[in-house]
């Protein structure tokens, strides 16, 4: 592929949602976008790289070429066959980092989408949603958060390993309108790579059967039968194994479920996601969270990633 140079002075922006993966049994496959957003603005320049970050993670992320958004922007440009001599990348983050809310997927999807906004000004064909999912999942290693960030709402995703390279794909689900979403976000952090090593390399047929049945039921519960959410969010493959690494979240999870709230770890934790048809959580649940350092927030399903040439103002 012949690579052409983008002119200096192009500006593009993207708005991308947080996401919760797994939702109990849907390990590495089911995801749900949430109404927390990161905003990204990218400008082409004659040379150099400037990265500016405000909000979540501002004092923790690298401000150079290794920044995830920078890597994703460059990946998106490369995929289309263009490059930029220099970039200014500005990130305004509301998605907490290392809490199981898809901050890395949002950074990658947002960076790729911002690249779309640049290439659209150079008479190039922007990346399709399928390409956004493929490229962002290659960064992540699994498509659940990435696909939720691309499509918005609830999704089911899968990996096809039949070819030379894994192919990642997803299909959107129509989330039932009676489902209310809550996130419980602790101060403590957890890295997916650190908790993934707690999972066994092999599982029993009994446990596999259990999770397959619950994952199938979860699709039904999310779309048609929210009264089945408690049973549909049961899991034996990853949450019990991760619990010792995050005792406060594990205890809060048990409390929520004792009060008939369909709660799970959000991704690898330590945040929790709760799905309920009730208009509010039980008072005991609210009080426990506040007393134990959790920020409890009602959410709605997040939108799919949005990109545009120029700067998008979020209302």
UniProtKB/Swiss-Prot annotation:
ATP binds at residues 96-106. It holds the Pfam family GHMP_kinases_N. Its EC number is 2.7.1.39. GO terms for biological process: threonine biosynthetic process. The keyword Transferase applies. Keywords: Amino-acid biosynthesis, ATP-binding, Cytoplasm, Kinase, Nucleotide-binding, Threonine biosynthesis, Transferase. GO terms for molecular function: ATP binding; homoserine kinase activity. Pathway: Amino-acid biosynthesis; L-threonine biosynthesis; L-threonine from L-aspartate: step 4/5. It is found in: Cytoplasm. It catalyses: L-homoserine + ATP = O-phospho-L-homoserine + ADP + H(+). It comes from the Bacteria. It is an enzyme of class 2 (transferase). One of its GO terms (cellular component) is cytoplasm. Catalyzes the ATP-dependent phosphorylation of L-homoserine to L-homoserine phosphate. Belongs to the GHMP kinase family. Homoserine kinase subfamily. This is Homoserine kinase. It comes from Mycolicibacterium paratuberculosis (strain ATCC BAA-968 / K-10) (Mycobacterium paratuberculosis).
């Amino acid at each position: 592929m012949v690579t052409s140079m983008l002119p200096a002075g192009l500006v593009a922006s993207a708005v991308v949602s947080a996401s919760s993966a797994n939702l109990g049994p849907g390990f590495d496959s089911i995801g749900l976008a949430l109404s927390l957003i990161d905003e990204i603005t990218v400008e082409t320049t004659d040379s150099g790289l400037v990265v500016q970050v405000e909000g979540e993670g501002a004092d923790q992320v690298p401000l150079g070429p290794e920044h995830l958004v920078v890597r994703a922007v460059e990946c998106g440009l490369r995929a289309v066959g263009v490059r930029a001599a220099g970039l200014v990348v500005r990130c305004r983050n509301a998605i907490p980092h290392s809490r199981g809310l898809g901050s890395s997927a949002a950074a990658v999807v947002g960076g790729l989408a911002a690249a779309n906004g640049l290439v659209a000004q150079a008479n190039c064909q922007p990346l399709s949603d399928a390409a956004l999912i493929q490229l962002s999942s290659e960064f992540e290693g699994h498509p659940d958060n990435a696909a939720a960030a691309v499509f918005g709402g609830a999704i089911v995703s899968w990996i096809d390993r039949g070819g030379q390279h894994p192919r990642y794909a997803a299909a959107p689900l129509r989330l039932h309108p009676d489902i209310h979403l809550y996130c419980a976000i602790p101060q403590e952090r957890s890295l997916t790579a650190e908790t993934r090593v707690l999972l066994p390399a092999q599982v029993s047929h009994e446990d596999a059967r259990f999770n397959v049945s619950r994952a199938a039921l979860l699709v039904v519960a999310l779309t048609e039968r929210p009264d089945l959410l408690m049973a549909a969010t049961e899991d034996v493959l990853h949450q019990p194994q991760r619990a010792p690494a995050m005792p406060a979240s594990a205890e809060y999870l048990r409390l929520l479920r004792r009060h008939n709230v369909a709660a799970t770890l959000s991704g690898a934790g330590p945040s929790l996601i709760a799905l309920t048809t009730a208009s509010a959580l039980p008072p005991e649940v609210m009080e426990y969270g506040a007393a134990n350092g959790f920020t409890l927030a009602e959410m709605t399903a997040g939108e799919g990633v949005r990109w545009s040439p120029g700067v998008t103002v979020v209302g």
